[in-house]
Amino acid sequence: MELELITIEKLAEILKNQYEESLKNEQVVNIHLFGIKYGEIIKKYSYSASKIIELSGLNKSYKTELSKGIRLSKFVKLKNEYSD
């Protein structure tokens, strides 16, 4: 399956929007979900979790949470209501 090219800037924008639109107590889990959803693209294009977090404007400590989601993408498939 061919993975669509999404720029690192676009990924950062998507992450920022997803984070800001989340309920306060679900923001971290939404970072994990983002990593799961876009993990294959992030890995294929060798994008850095640190750079995505930096470009998104989120606290740099969230890099760890994004990295967890990216690693989980190898094992987890999102339910339809969480994917495009």
Language-model-derived ranges and their functions:
Residues 1-9:
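General nucleic-acid-binding
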Residues 62-83:
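Short, solvent-exposed alpha-helical "recognition" segments
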Residues 1-2, 82-84:
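Intrinsically disordered, low-complexity and often Lys/Arg-enriched segments
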Residues 11-37:
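Short, Lys/Arg-enriched anionic-surface-contact patches
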Residues 48-55:
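Short alpha-helical "recognition helix" segments of helix-turn-helix
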Residues 45:
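Flexible coil/turn residues that form the inter-helical turn or adjacent wing/linker of helix-turn-helix
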